[in-house]
Amino acid sequence: REWQAAIDEMTKLLSKKATERLIDKQLSESPDKMYAFFIFDIDEFKMVNDRYGHSFGDFCICSFSDILKSHFREGDILGRIGGDEFAAFIQVSDTECVEEKVKILSSALHTVIGRGDIRCSVTASIGIALYPRDGATFEDLYQQADRALYETKQRGKDGFTIVS
């Protein structure tokens, strides 16, 4: 039962609670390493749901999560932390590699998702916080990355912001 609560049923990604637990565990076990925490939000997802229905919206979320899964390594932490919001936590060597990674992700998430006769252009806004610079816990990093995500949305979506 605890395992079921740790996994998001639709996407098979970690739940928010499991994501938080694993990140805090990793930070306590390896506090001397550098990490990047990403929040991904599907742009205009409410409009997709309203226009094409919840079944297609669920299909979009699953397709989006599949794209994310294909761009992370085993050992990276990847979770669904809200309706159309996802998080990733990876070990990094420097901020330049974070920028390279997020550019690749942003490009991959700018896609067309289709099923049957429906085709929908999808983009994502991304906020990124770095450990240890931007916080010492999941909650710290989440708040900072969420602020960066908000900045991305304010600038017009379909992009990314790294906390500065």
PLM segments and residue spans:
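Conserved long alpha-helical elements within nucleotide-processing catalytic cores of c-di-GMP signaling
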Residues: 2-6, 14-36, 43-73, 79-83, ...
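Acidic carboxylate motifs that coordinate Ca2+ or other divalent cations, activating on Asp/Glu
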Residues: 11
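A structural signal for short, well-ordered beta-strand segments
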Residues: 37, 86, 124-128
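Core hydrophobic beta-sheet residues of small sensory/regulatory alpha/beta domains
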Residues: 37-39, 162
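Residue-level recognition of strand-loop junctions within catalytic nucleotide-signaling folds
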Residues: 50, 89-93, 110, 131-132
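Short catalytic/binding micro-motifs of nucleotide second-messenger systems
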Residues: 70-75, 107-119, 151
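Cyclic nucleotide signaling catalytic output domains
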Residues: 78, 104, 118-119, 125-155, ...
